């Protein structure tokens, strides 16, 4: 399965609760933290919801 690198580039402070949960669900903890997640429809949905706080590669 393909993977995608996701980096948190903006703070989750003051954001919508559902968007905070999406960032947490992706495994991101702090600004600048990068994780590699599988490219599944579930992960893509979380990325699409919180796209304005994330940088996606791959």
Swiss-Prot record:
Top-rank taxon: Bacteria
UniProt keyword annotations, A-Z: Ribonucleoprotein, Ribosomal protein
MF terms (GO), sorted A to Z: structural constituent of ribosome
One GO BP annotation of this record: translation
GO cellular component: cytosolic large ribosomal subunit
InterPro entries per record: Ribo_uL30_ferredoxin-like_sf (IPR036919), Ribosomal_uL30_bac-type (IPR005996), Ribosomal_uL30_ferredoxin-like (IPR016082)
Keyword Transmembrane helix: no
Key word Ribonucleoprotein present: yes
Similarity remark: Belongs to the universal ribosomal protein uL30 family.
Quaternary organization: Part of the 50S ribosomal subunit.
Designated name of the protein: Large ribosomal subunit protein uL30
Organism of this sequence: Pseudomonas putida (strain ATCC 47054 / DSM 6125 / CFBP 8728 / NCIMB 11950 / KT2440)
């Amino acid at each position: 399965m393909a993977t995608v690198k996701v980096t948190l580039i903006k703070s989750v402070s003051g954001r919508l609760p559902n968007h905070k949960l999406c960032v947490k669900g992706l495994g991101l903890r702090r600004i600048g933290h990068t994780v590699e997640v599988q490219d599944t429809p579930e992960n893509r949905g979380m990325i699409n919801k919180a796209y304005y706080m994330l940088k996606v590669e791959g």
